[in-house]
Amino acid sequence: MSIEVVNESGIDVAEGELVSVARFAIAAMDVHPAAELSMMLVDLAAMADLHMRWMDLPGPTDVMSFPMDELEPGGRPDAPEPGPSMLGDIVLCPQFAAEQAEAAGHSLAHELALLTVHGVLHLLGYDHAEPEEEREMFALQNQLLQDWYEQQAQLYRDSRLLDKSRNFDE
C-alpha cells in the first residue's frame, strides 16, 4: 500500500502517524492492499479555496476527500480480480484542526488522526448527511481510531519488552 503525504500547511505534523492511521483504517476496511492514497496538508486559504470550489461553501474546513476509483470495503487480496489502485486524495487543514482540537480538549495529533480516518471513510463512500448515516459513520470512525490507538499501545509495549530483552542479553 502506497501512501504519499505532502505538507504545504506550514505546520509541522507527525506525518508518520498520519500514514500509520490511514494504513490501519484502509486495512481494517478490507481495501485491496495495492490501493494508493495521497494526503495533502494545506493552509487555511488553500482549504477555503478548495471548499468553495468543490462544495460551494465559504471558508475553510477540516478535511476534504476526493475519491478516484470506486472502492468498497471487502476488496480482499484473494478476490478473483484485483481492486482499483487509486483510493483517492485526503486534504487536511492542520490550522483548522488545531482550533477544533483545542475546543474539544485534545491534541492536534489526535484530531488529525481522527480526521484521517474520517477522510478514509468518505473515500469508501461513507457519509453523514442524514442522521442514520452520521451515526453509522461516526461509530465506525471512533471504533477504528480506538483500535488504532490500541495497536499503537501494543506496539509500544512490545518494543519496550524487546529493549529490556536486549539489555538482559548484554
Swiss-Prot record:
Gene of origin? ybeY
Q: Return the protein name.
A: Endoribonuclease YbeY
- InterPro entries from the entry? MetalPrtase_cat_dom_sf_prd, YbeY, YbeY_CS
Tell me the NCBIfam families matching this sequence.
rRNA maturation RNase YbeY (TIGR00043)
UniProt: Zn(2+) binding residues:
118, 122, 128
Q: List UniProt keywords, sorted A-Z.
A: Cytoplasm, Endonuclease, Hydrolase, Metal-binding, Nuclease, Ribosome biogenesis, rRNA processing, Zinc
* A Pfam family recorded for this sequence: YbeY
Give the EC number(s) under which this enzyme is classified.
Answer: 3.1.-.-
Q: Report the domain of life of the source organism.
A: Bacteria
Q: A GO CC term?
A: cytoplasm
Which classification does the entry list for the species? Bacteria, Bacillati, Actinomycetota, Actinomycetes, Mycobacteriales
Cite the cofactor comment: Binds 1 zinc ion.
